[in-house]
C-alpha cells in the first residue's frame, strides 16, 4: 500500500542528513575526549569499535524487529535521541558514561536508518522508489560531508559544553515529523504471512548473500578511499587543507552519484545500474591510486570514483526490499550499514597490507573488489516487481 505524504522524501532525507551528522561527531571530538578522559590509543580504538558495532552491525537486528512491530510512532524522537548524547558529552565525567553515550547514539542512528528507508519505500509514488531513495541517500552523505566543516568551526568559538546549542535543529525536525503524518504509516508488511519467514531463511537467501557481499566489496573500495585518502595525499607532500578539499570532492561525487544512479534506476533495471557503475568505477579508482595528485585532473578522477562508487546504493536498497518484502526493515539495515561493516573488514586488511607493501599499492589492491562485486550483483536474482 502506498501512502501519500506531502514532502515525505524531503523530511526523511533531511532527518537522514541530521542523524548522520550527529552520528559522526566522534572522530572530530576524539582528540578532545582523549585529553578530557586521559584515553589511550587502545581505548580510543575500543570507543570507535563500540560506535561502529552499534551503528552498523545492529541495523539488520533492529530492522528485523521492525518487520514484526510498527515503530513509525518513534520516528520524531530518533533524531533527537541520536544527537542529544553526543551534544551532552561535555558534561560526562566518567569513562563508562562516555561509552554509554556513544552506544546510545549508535543505537538511535541504527534505528533511524531502516525505519526511514522503509517509509521512503511506502510513500514514494509508483515507479519512483529508486529516485526517492537516491535523495534519501544524498541526505545522509551531505550530513557526513558537513561534519568537519561545521563542528570544527563551532569548537573554534565555543567550548565543548556549548554543544547542546546544536540540538535546536533536532527539535524542529521532530515537530515536522509529528505534523507530517509519517507516524501513521505502518512499517508492517501489507500482507502478513500466515507462516512468517524464519530468520535463517532470510539470512541465507541467495539474494541476501550475494547482494550483501557485492555491496560489502563495494564498501571496501569506498571505505579505503574515505579512510586513507587524506593520509595518502599528506604522504605525497600535500598539506592537510588540500587533503581535506579532495576528500570533500570525493564525497560530493558520491552524493551526486547516488542521486543520478537512483533516478536512472527508475527507468533502467537496478542490476544494470549496479553492475555498470561498479565496472565503470575500476578505471578512475585504479588511475588515482597510481597517479596521486591534487590538480584538476586528479579532482575530476576522484569525483568520478566517488560518483560510481555511490551510484549503486539506492538501487541495492530497493532491490533488497522488493526481494524480501516481509523483511523490508532487515533488508534496509543490511544494505544501508551492514554492508559498510563488511567493507570495514576489507579496509582493515588494506591497512595491514599497507604496512607491508606501502599505502598506494595496498589501496590499488582494494580496487580488485569492484569486478568481484559486479559479478556477484550480476548473478543476484532480480525481484519481479
Predicted regions: what they are:
Residues 24, 52-60, 145, 251-255, ...:
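Residue-level signature of mid-helix packing/kink "hotspots" within the transmembrane helices
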Residues 57-93:
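Conserved MFS/SLC helix-loop-helix module at the cytosolic interface between two early adjacent transmembrane helices
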Residues 326-356:
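A late C-terminal transmembrane helix in Major Facilitator Superfamily
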Amino acid at each position: 500500500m502506498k501512502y501519500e505524504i506531502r514532502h515525505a522524501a524531503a523530511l526523511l532525507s533531511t532527518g537522514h542528513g541530521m542523524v548522520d551528522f550527529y552520528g559522526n561527531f566522534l572522530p572530530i571530538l576524539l582528540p578532545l575526549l582523549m585529553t578530557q578522559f586521559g584515553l589511550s590509543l587502545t581505548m580510543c580504538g575500543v570507543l570507535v569499535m563500540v560506535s561502529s558495532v552499534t551503528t552498523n552491525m545492529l541495523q539488520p537486528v533492529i530492522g528485523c524487529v521492525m518487520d514484526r512491530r510498527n515503530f513509525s510512532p518513534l520516528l520524531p524522537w530518533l533524531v533527537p535521541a541520536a544527537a542529544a548524547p553526543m551534544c551532552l558529552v561535555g558534561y560526562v565525567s566518567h569513562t563508562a558514561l562516555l561509552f554509554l553515550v556513544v552506544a546510545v547514539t549508535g543505537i538511535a542512528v541504527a534505528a533511524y536508518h531502516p525505519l526511514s528507508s522503509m517509509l521512503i519505500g511506502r510513500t514514494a509514488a509508483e515507479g519512483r522508489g529508486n529516485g526517492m531513495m537516491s535523495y534519501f541517500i544524498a541526505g545522509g552523505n551531505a550530513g557526513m560531508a558537513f561534519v568537519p566543516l561545521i563542528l570544527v568551526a563551532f569548537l573554534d568559538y565555543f567550548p565543548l559544553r556549548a554543544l547542546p546549542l546544536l540540538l535546536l535543529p533536532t527539535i524542529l525536525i521532530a515537530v515536522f515529523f509529528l505534523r507530517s503524518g509519517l507516524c501513521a504509516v505502518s512499517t508492517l508488511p501489507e500482507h502478513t504471512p500466515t507462516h512468517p519467514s524464519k530468520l535463517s531463511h532470510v539470512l541465507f537467501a541467495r539474494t541476501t548473500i550475494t547482494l550483501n557481499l557485492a555491496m560489502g566489496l563495494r564498501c571496501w573500495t569506498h571505505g579505503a578511499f574515505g579512510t586513507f585518502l587524506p593520509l595518502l595525499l599528506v604522504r605525497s607532500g600535500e598539506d592537510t587543507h588540500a587533503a581535506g578539499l579532495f576528500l570533500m570532492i570525493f564525497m560530493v561525487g558520491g552524493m551526486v552519484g547516488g542521486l543520478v544512479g537512483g533516478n536512472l534506476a527508475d527507468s533502467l533495471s537496478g542490476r544494470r545500474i549496479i553492475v555498470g557503475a561498479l565496472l565503470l568505477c575500476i578505471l578512475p579508482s585504479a588511475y588515482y591510486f597510481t597517479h596521486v595528485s591534487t590538480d584538476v585532473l586528479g579532482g575530476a578522477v576522484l569525483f568520478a570514483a566517488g560518483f560510481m562508487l555511490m551510484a549503486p546504493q539506492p538501487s541495492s536498497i530497493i532491490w533488497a526490499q522488493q526481494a524480501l518484502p516481509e523483511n523490508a526493515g532487515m533488508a534496509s539495515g543490511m544494505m544501508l550499514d551492514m554492508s559498510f561493516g563488511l567493507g570495514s573488514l576489507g579496509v582493515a586488511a588494506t591497512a595491514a597490507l599497507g604496512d607491508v607493501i606501502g599505502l598506494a599499492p595496498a589501496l590499488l589492491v582494494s580496487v580488485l573488489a569492484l569486478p568481484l562485486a559486479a559479478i556477484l550483483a550480476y548473478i543476484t536474482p532480480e525481484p519481479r516487481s
